[in-house]
Every structure is written in C-alpha cells, then in structure tokens.
Regions:
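CN hydrolase (nitrilase-like) catalytic-core segments centered on the catalytic cysteine
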Residues: 104-125, 192, 198-285
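Short beta-strand scaffold segments in enzyme catalytic cores
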Residues: 126-128, 142-145, 184-186, 265-267, ...
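N-terminal, active-site-proximal structural segment of metallo-dependent hydrolase catalytic domains
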Residues: 6-16, 21-80, 86-90
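C-terminal beta-strand edge segments of enzyme domains
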Residues: 2-12, 16, 21-36, 43, ...
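Cys-nucleophile CN-hydrolase/nitrilase-fold catalytic domain and related Cys-dependent amidase chemistry
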Residues: 59, 68-149, 155, 224-244
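Active-site catalytic loop in hydrolytic enzyme cores
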Residues: 102-105, 134-211, 224-233, 296-303
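Short, glycine-anchored, charge-dense loop/turn motifs used at functional sites
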Residues: 48, 145-153, 268-276
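Beta-strand-turn-beta hairpins that frame and shape the catalytic cleft
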Residues: 39-48, 185-194, 215
Length: 312
C-alpha cells in the first residue's frame, strides 16, 4: 500500500464518536473556521442508524428481522433509525405489494412501526409501506416517520417511479405504484429531515425543492447493476451539493424472486465522506451527526447562499 495513502486522516466529522467510521482515500474534510460560531455552545452530536436487509415475501418474518436490527441500532445509541425500501416485503412478483396494501393509519406494518418507535423511544422511519391508492391495482410507496412517542409525524409518497430496460433486467414501477406529488420535509429534534426514496436520488431538483435540510434520508432497493455503477456517486453528490448528511439504508443481497440488490447502505457527511458502510447482508450502519461541524462547513463554503438560478 502507498505509505501516503495509509496515513490519510479521517475528518473531524468521523472522529468524534461517530460509530464505525473508517479511513477512506477520499479527500479529508477541511477544518472550517469557527469564529462565526465561537459565542455559541456546540450543538450536541446525535447518532443515527440505517438498517440493511435482504427481505423476502413473508411480512411477519421481515418484521421480526427489522425488530432485531432496530434493537441492535438502539444498543449502539441511535436515536433515529431508518429502514430500507420495501423492508416489510420483497415479493415473488410485483403485485405482491398490492395484495398486502394497508389503509392509511391501519394495518400490521404501521402498527409495528408505531409500537417499535414508542417502545424503543426512537424516531423511526419505515419505508416502504404499501398504502391504498385511488386505483385498486396500484399502491403508494409510502415512507412514514414516527416520533419517539410512536406518533406518526410525516408521510412521503415516492414521486419518481423506477423504469429500467437493460438486457435481461426489466422494471416498471408504474404498473403497481401510484406516484406521489408532494415534497416532504419533517422538523425533528435533529434538524430538518428531507424524505426521498430510491429512484428519487437521481433527481437533484427534488432536494433543491426541500430548501435547506440538515439530513437527507433515502431508503433504497437499488439493483446490483445500477447500484454498482451509480449508487455511491449519487449518494455522495447529494450530500456535497446540499452540504447535508445523507442516511441511505438499502436492501442488500439475493431475494427469493431472483432479484439481486446492491446493498452498500451508508451514511455520508456534508463533505461527501462515507462515515459507515455495509456492503452486503443484514446489519446496520451507525454514525454521529454533528450540527456544529455542518454549520461550520456551510459557513466556510456557503454554496447554498450562492445559488443564482432559482427554479423551485
């Protein structure tokens, strides 16, 4: 190994109790000037976690696995936990999600999320919950946010529906998914959290429409083909251009349907540094979110204030 590379410094964001942060060969984050914040006490660091699964068609089994992994995250101090896209069901066929649809506010998946958030005293983000749509053959791909009392505080319906026609891989979510319309940001004790799902990641204008957010959450089930080519690049790009943390829990592995998902759940800081990553299989990623560090970065590189083309 190149000696210089072996001495790469992990940025301050990855050293202050930030879970399993690992050195990377990416450029280390600078030490931002602290003068503008000198009179203010540092904001507390809080820990977030993303769950990675390789879900199957059995909802009860998936909920049990999600519960186990959430408990693991709580044991590591996470106060906000996000589940991957379709955590409760990766069916044998696309229409399976329609067959387990739930009414808004009712059903076993929503009850699981509410009860778990309340019992573990965490903020919990569950995606995807297949909620009823006006069309009986389609459901909403809904992302639900519960506070630490178990109360639902936000719902986001996936806006951009994935289509792929590449060799032997064919996907068309619009056959079974009803597209959402509304951009959603939720106010939390941890700052403004922007909600998005999987394919949304390819549309930077969605994140601009969120205005200024502190944390972006993007539960996903990227295919191995598209994930290998684009996943990390897209995650880090959204973090860098918005100077925001990104929490990206993902499906990762082989599924009974024959589908392979990319995994590589990760947490990325506002400088684009990967703080934690899980390549494959069930598990969690955990890292600390440092609001003071983020504010200093935004002060040192005020790109968000320099936008001159305002389209949204």
């Amino acid at each position: 190994m190149n000696k210089a590379a072996s001495k790469t410094k992990v940025p301050a964001s990855a050293r202050s109790g930030f879970g399993r942060a690992r050195p990377h060969t990416h450029a280390a984050a600078p030490q931002p000037k602290s003068e503008p914040l000198a009179e203010s006490p540092p904001a507390p660091i809080f820990r977030v976690a993303g769950v990675q699964m390789a879900s199957g068609p059995n909802v009860a089994a998936n909920l049990n696995e999600a519960r186990r992994l959430i408990e693991m995250a709580v044991e590591q101090g996470a106060r906000l936990v996000a589940l991957p896209e379709w955590f409760a069901c990766m069916g044998l066929k696309d229409t399976d999600k329609v067959s387990i649809r739930e009414k808004d506010g009712e059903g076993p998946i929503q009850k699981f999320l509410s009860d778990t958030a309340r019992r573990k005293k965490i903020w919990l983000i569950g995606c995807s919950v297949p909620l009823e749509s006006p069309e009986s053959a389609r459901v909403y791909n809904s992302m639900l946010v519960y506070d630490d009392s178990g109360k639902r505080v936000a719902r986001y319906d996936k806006i951009h529906l994935f289509t792929l026609d590449l060799g032997k891989e064919h996907f068309s979510e619009e056959r079974t998914i009803q597209a959402g319309r509304d951009v959603k940001v939720v106010e939390t004790p941890f700052g403004r959290v922007g909600l998005s799902v999987c394919y949304d990641l390819r549309f930077p204008e969605l994140y601009r429409a969120m205005k200024e957010v502190d944390l972006i959450v993007v539960p996903s089930a990227f295919t191995e083909t598209t994930g290998r080519a684009h996943w990390e690049t897209l995650i880090r790009a959204r973090a860098i251009e918005n100077l925001a943390y990104v929490l990206a829990p993902a499906q990762g592995g082989y599924h009974l349907s024959g589908r392979e998902t990319h995994g590589n759940s990760m947490i990325v800081d506002p400088w684009g540094v990967v703080l934690d990553r899980l390549p494959r299989g069930s598990g969690i990623v955990v890292a600390g979110i440092n609001p003071t560090y983020q504010a200093q970065l935004r002060d040192s590189l005020p790109a968000l204030k320099h936008r001159t083309i305002q389209r949204v």
